A protein has these predicted regions:
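Carbohydrate-active catalytic/glycan-binding domains of CAZyme proteins
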Residues: 1-178
Length: 178
């Protein structure tokens, strides 16, 4: 257990290379939301998280990292990827980016901008897109992460049903191309 406020999805996994449990959760860095990381030998006891991702100098003052979407490349134990959701508070808009890590500790943003953005107004994903957890192989030579979409923005009054589920997908082996 850890006594920490985290109002978004959290994930915890056993890292066989580190031989420790690693959890990713909401964190606050200088009063701005970010992604926290906590590590423990004991699944029942975690320290407070430390900053893993926080708003960097390339981001606008109203932008922050909202949810982590941490996973691994399918079939690997040591190829870590994260699909964090960036929130522009001013525009009440989310988009999803791609980060990679060679060690489940140090994270780098893959250049090229968002890997997933909201759809057109009125579409099932026209207001919000949010990553799920788990990059998996899909039929038809694809791989993808679960995605939740909503027709209305995050701070817009809404009632059930709140959204729909879909996939953000790429051709297998083509998540990043050089």
């Amino acid at each position: 257990l850890v006594a920490q406020y985290s109002d978004t999805h959290n994930m915890c996994e056993y890292d066989p290379v580190l031989e420790q449990y690693v959890a990713y959760c909401r964190n606050w860095f200088f009063s701005r939301r970010g992604i926290g990381r906590a590590v423990s030998d004991n699944f029942r006891r975690f320290p407070l998280s430390e900053e893993a991702l926080w708003p960097d100098p390339t981001m606008d003052p109203d932008e922050l990292w909202y949810a982590n979407g941490k996973t691994k490349m399918p079939g690997t134990n040591d190829y870590h990827v994260m699909f964090p959701k960036r929130w522009s508070i001013r525009h009440d808009k989310f988009d999803i980016h791609l980060f990679t890590s060679p060690d489940n500790l140090i994270w780098h943003r893959v250049p090229g901008g968002p890997v997933c953005e909201v759809g057109d107004p009125g579409d099932w994903d026209g207001g919000v897109v949010a990553p799920g957890i788990g990059l998996v192989e899909l039929p038809g030579g694809r791989m993808g992460v679960p995605l939740v979409g909503s027709k209305v923005p995050h701070k817009y009054p809404r009632k059930a049903p709140l959204g729909a589920i879909g996939w953000a997908w790429w051709p297998k082996g083509r998540l990043v191309a050089l």
